[in-house]
């Protein structure tokens, strides 16, 4: 009898273990759930949801935007990668070959682009007015007096206090054109203390955060510090909270690209780039990042909405008959402007745009001071990009901060845009070619990040 009872108890134990094992297997989350379970529904401070953005971006906007960014006007960006870091001297330059940037030879850049960054309209290029300009490279010698005054006004405006970025002097001998298609943003191996210092300075000194508040994961402070941080963040005014989320979203977007274009194989035969799901999990898995990863991805969507709104606001500037995406190739220039306007009208049709009217809407004096603080903090972040030790990372960091800075400039210039003349130069609101190229390429990076999230969702579905 005792032996029979023992056998029965043993069998029941085996059944229980099998069932409990099955239950654990059924309850075990996939990596996709851990990364994306919280990345759905409505975004904080917005009336828009993640699913609407995914559908709009991935199927209506992304393909056309990529085609535009492959055109000559948008693929060449002039940048000075040799500016010294204004904050510290001990920069360890990345010696890896993937950190290097290959600048363009002079004959690779279309003449129309090389002429000057402000010469993008009929007036500025004098395509019809100036019969003496046989070569665009000599356009300075053929400018009319009226146009010279306009150029002077535009230069003053570009250097004015409305700028959100510390822009490069593109006339400097150290400034070179870079083909963005030949120098893509991807994993370079740049990491460690130097990379951490860049982001630490950005977050700790430029996001309105007191030193007494610790960022989650910044120094392994645990759950209590995380709760303290988010209690502090929620207590901020909407403008300062938005500023932090924009920087976090930009950081997230960059990390998505590094994970999506990772060096998987490197030998004498070939280099193979592709999706690294392990790298993505380390940056965004809710368990591995103590809940931070999904928050970062939601901030990426917030950044998308801000830049999308700026593009919808600036449509009148590009709709003016005088505006051209000038490269010197008349047929392509016309086609590219048509594609640009098609994209901007699509952007304008987005049903759930961010409402920027909540920004700086209080007391006028306080709002003015807050806006100035906002601008100066972001301008400082753009200067930090010159401290990045990896030249390719520096290139894309400078471009994306200038693009976001241009988006903010547009959002805070609504009245100036509304009062622009339908033709002729606009003295009150102006965009240089550098700003235009950075604006659309920066948004292209974010759009690509959102598209890549769908790819990672599929790749992580069966990963535990």
Swiss-Prot record:
Enzyme class: oxidoreductase
Modified residues (Phosphoserine): 106, 142, 144
Chief place of localization: endoplasmic reticulum
Subcellular location: Endoplasmic reticulum membrane; Golgi apparatus lumen; Secreted; Cell projection, Dendrite
Residues modified by glycosylation: 276, 380
Presence of keyword Oxidoreductase: yes
Gene Ontology molecular functions: FAD binding; oxidoreductase activity; protein-disulfide reductase activity; thiol oxidase activity
SS bond partners: 35-48, 37-46, 85-387, 94-99, 94-130, 99-104, 207-237, 390-393
EC number: 1.8.4.-
Activity control, per UniProt: Enzyme activity is tightly regulated to prevent the accumulation of reactive oxygen species in the endoplasmic reticulum. Reversibly down-regulated by the formation of disulfide bonds between the active site Cys-94 and Cys-130, and between Cys-99 and Cys-104. Glutathione may be required to regulate its activity in the endoplasmic reticulum.
Known role: Oxidoreductase involved in disulfide bond formation in the endoplasmic reticulum. Efficiently reoxidizes P4HB/PDI, the enzyme catalyzing protein disulfide formation, in order to allow P4HB to sustain additional rounds of disulfide formation. Following P4HB reoxidation, passes its electrons to molecular oxygen via FAD, leading to the production of reactive oxygen species (ROS) in the cell. Required for the proper folding of immunoglobulins. Plays an important role in ER stress-induced, CHOP-dependent apoptosis by activating the inositol 1,4,5-trisphosphate receptor IP3R1.
Protein name stated in the entry: ERO1-like protein alpha
Taxonomic classification: Eukaryota, Metazoa, Chordata, Craniata, Vertebrata
